Every structure is written in C-alpha cells, then in structure tokens.
Amino acid sequence: MERQPASTGSRQELGRLLEAVLSNRGRANAVFDILAVLQSEDPEEIKEGVRTCSRLFGTLLEREELFVGSLPCEDMALAGSQGATYKYKVWMRHRYHSCCNRLEELLTHPSFQVKELALETLMKFVQLEGAKPLEKPQWESHYLFPRTLFRAVVGGLLTPEDDHSLLISQFCEYLEYDDIRYHAMQVATSILARATSRQPEVSLTFWNNAFTLLSAVNLPLQEHELTNFYVKHAQTSSKWKVVHLKEQRKAFQEMWLGFLKHKLPLSLYKKVLVAMHDSILPHLAQPTLMIDFLTSACDVGGAISLLALNGLFILIHKHNLEYPDFYQRLYGLLDPSIFHVKYRARFFHLADLFLSSSHLPAYLVAAFAKRLARLALTAPPEALLMVLPLICNLLRRHPACRVMVHRPQGPELDADPYDPTEKDPARSRALESCLWELQTLQQHYHPEVSRAASVINQALSVPEVSIAPLLELTAYEIFEQDLKKMMPESVPLEFIPAKGLLGRQDDLCTQFFCLS
C-alpha cells in the first residue's frame, strides 16, 4: 500500500522553521528540528526535509554565513573568546556537515525518489561550495573544488551492497560538465585502488556500479571543447589541470587501468571489450598500455578472445604495435561453435575487417578460406549465406589464392593436403589444397545456399559482395522469405504436360480405356 504524501501542516511547519532560521540568528536552534525530519521513516516527510535543507543551507552558502577555513572543534569554538558571529558560523557549519552526512546516508534509502532528491541536493551543494569555497585559497588564482564533499557523493554511488545503476544514470547527467567529469575520474580511481585492500573478495555489485560509472565517461575530442564547467568561476586559469584535455586523458587512463588491473567477472570482461575500441582506446593518453589486458583477455578463450582481438587490431593498425601471433589467434577461434555464439555477427564482421588488407600473404588468406570452407560443411543455412560470400571476397582480394578453385597445371590429388588440426596457418598447407567443400555445397538442400556456392563456377566479379546485410540473418528470417516468395501459377512436375488422368503419351491405358 502506498504511503500518503506529507501533510500540508508538516510542510508549512518546515517553512516556518526555515524562515525562522534565516531571518533570526537567535532562533538558529530550529535547524535541529529541520534535520530531525531527515531521520523520519516516511519517504514523503524525508523529501520535504531534504527540500527544506536544500533551501536553508543553499541560502547560507550564498550569504557566506558558514565558517571558511579549517573547521575547529565545535565545543572549543563555542567555549572560546571569539565573537558571536564567529561562533555562529562555526556552529552552523557543523550543522551543514551533519546535513551532508545524512544526505549521503540517504543515497542508500529504499525509495528511489529519496535517493534521487538527496543526490540532486548534494550536487547543488557541490556547485555552491565551488562558487563560495569553505576553504581558503593557498595562493591567488588557486583552483578550488569541494573535493571532500564530492568524494563522498561518488563514494556513495560506488557501494558494494546496493545496485546503484539507476542512480548512477541520473548522476551521468553531471558528467557532461568538464570539471565534474575530471574529479569523478580522480575519485573513482582512488576508490578502485582501495577496493581490494579493504577486503580480498569484492562483490559483483561493486564492480557493476563501477563499470556503469566508468562507461558513462566520454571525453571531448578537441581541447577547445572544454568550456562547460559546473562550478562557475569569475575567470579560468591555464594553470588549472581541469581545463586541459591532456590532463583529462591522463585521468581517464588512470581510471580505466586501475579498474582493469583487478580480477573482473567474465560478464564485465565482455562489456569492457565491447566498448574498448570506440569508447576507451581513442581517449587514452597512451593506448599501448592496454596491451597487457588485451593479451590476457586473448588467453581466456571463447567470446572474450574474439572481442579482445578488435582492440589488438586497433593497436596494431593505428599505434604500430607488434603482435605476430594476432592472425594465429584469430585462426584458432575458427571452430564449429563460432556459428552458434552470441557474438557471431560481430566476429565475422571483425574477421572480414582483419582480412581486408591486400598485403596479407597468400598462404595466410588461403588458410582462412580453407578453414571457413571446411566449417561450412556442417554450418546452418543462415551461417552459410554469410560465410560463402566471405570466402569469395577473400578470393577476390587475393588472386593468388584462386588456384584453390582452378589449378590447370596442378598434380592429381588422392587426398586433401590441408591439415585441419594444425594451429599455425603457415603450416596448414591450405594453399596446396582446393576448395572442394564449395563444390559439395552446390548440392545443398537449400537453393539459396546452392546458388551462393555456385558463384565459384564462374569468373568472380571485381566488386566485392557486402556481407553486412547477412551478418545477423536468422533461420526464422530465411523461413519467412521462403513463405513470401511468389510461386508460378502452374508448377511443372513433368517434362511433357499431362492431359487428363490418362493423357500421357505411350500410356497403355489410353489405348484400351476411355473415361467419359
């Protein structure tokens, strides 16, 4: 049963208390009554209390009525000989800290609306503290940011107990601001560094929360785009690290390296590798530092190895990384299960990309073509309609491999020289073999597969056939296409059309019987 909203009387009472605190310092003790509402068990009352605290301390920050500097002990300050204004500011700053601490606790409240409102209020305080700092600058133009408060906010999101994916998605709106993004990366790095030091086994919830936050960080491509700051300053200084894209990339790199050095669940490995090539590598200060992570992922096997090859290919192609075993690892992933994995479409898209260079040696391309052809013998029709054009594209790109289709001066073969058990494509002897598998598939039961395999019977056209529309083809789609085909009005069943039940030529029945 849903709770009833807070009564109008309660809201009015909080309004009177707020007005009393802001208008008369002599009634400052009313702030305790406001803070007490934050301890209520009613979510509606808590939300009213949070809104009141937001207006109260937001106004005090703007008026600069909170103590600025290293906060002294409350009891010592009140017992000292300083003036009433000094004591009031110290006392009220302690109440402000109590409010922030309670708001941080509310980030784990069962009600999402309470958590969302607490987050909004804390971020409002971050903005106001940045504009009216509660610490004294060490020198002129010193960059001040409420790091302590902001660290508590991010720490409240990255908890090992509660799934904060929805709340983090709300926080991601603030990551559009360049200063929030920069400090969020720094705080996340420090939290990740302490993650395993406190306890050896870290919960999956923590890693999921961390990945949700990290994957939401997007850096601009040009430094002149760093103009959107959450904390407004009268003027910016080129000495501030937050205004330089180079420093943002360093923070981005440290954050991801700090995350990836831990032993992650396999589900997160896959998510990281899917985002690696377009969301992580382009923004790193030194992309080659990912080589250890990617090579380790390659050793895991299965879909993880497949996804890791994409990042390795980018490092090889764009950053001159030497990795001689790249194509051998790709070759090793070609087994019958590749047609049935979740990432089948992505794998063949990447394989087509990796084998697109015309500078690859002929023996290597021949090994891939032969392995694909051998696997095609047991592949389902939807996979064959994708694999067969890919094999033909390999032959188009590398004319030296066409001897596998037609070898006029070749010797007679009584056995296939290709060794399917050889892991090294250079030793598989694929170039000495032929693609007899394609001729076998010309007798396939599905006419579209038979037609695709028959392409090699003719001279291959120069332009390649795009396999992109075929990557995600399913058996259901093939079945639907067959159902939608328009059949001719009369289906020919014999070479000579029959005329009646006994109308065949040379039929003895027609010679002696007549149906009337």
Curated annotation (Swiss-Prot):
Please state the protein's primary subcellular location: nucleus
In terms of Pfam families, this protein maps to: CBF
The cellular location(s) given in this protein's UniProt record come to: Nucleus membrane; Nucleus, Nucleolus
* SUPFAM superfamilies in the record: ARM repeat
Q: Which residues cross the membrane?
A: 296-316, 347-367, 375-395
Q: What is the lineage of its organism?
A: Eukaryota, Metazoa, Chordata, Craniata, Vertebrata
- The answer to whether keyword Transmembrane helix applies is yes
Q: What is this protein called?
A: Nucleolar complex protein 4 homolog
